[in-house]
C-alpha cells in the first residue's frame, strides 16, 4: 500500500524526526531562545534589518489617518483635530516619549521580532484625554508565577487563564529605571491589556517570533 510520501522514512526524509504536541508544549521551551536569536539578527544582521524594515514599511507606511464620517462636517473637523493632538507623544504615551505613529511602528517591529507586544490601557488624570498607552515587552511576563488570583484558574507563561482558556490577568515583572528587576510582580486584569500577537493553533497560549522559520537561513 502506498500512503503519503511526506510520511515515509526513506533516504529523502532520513534524519527528519518529528512528533506532535500541543502548541504550548512545542513553544514553551523554544520561545525565549528564538526571541533572543531574532533580536540578535535585528541588531547585527543587514539581511535581518532589511527584512524587518521592509515589513514595517509595508505594514504601517506613513501611519494612521483618522477620517471621521459623521453627518456633521463641524464634528468631523473637531474629531480630526483632537485625534491629531492625542497622537502626540505627551498625550498618547504614558512615558511621553513616542507619538502614536512611532508606537505603532515599534509594535509592528516587536511583533515580527519578539512575536508580540502588550499594550496596557492607562486611565490618567487630566490631559487632553484621560487615556494613554503603555507598551510592555513580552519578556516582562512573569513566567515563574504559578498561583492564580481566582479559584479554578491556571497560570501559564505569566498569564492567568480561566477553564475556557480565556486570559483573565497578566503577571508583569517590575524593573527600575536602570533595568534591574524588582521582587514583586504586578497583576493586571485582562480587560486593561491589549495583547498583539498571532495565534496559529487553537492550543497556542503565547507568542512566538514571526522570524522563527527564517532565523537559521538569515544567520
Question: Model segments located where?
Answer:
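N-terminal-proximal low-complexity accessory segments that begin disordered
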Residues: 1-70
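Extended, charged amphipathic alpha-helical segments
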Residues: 196-219
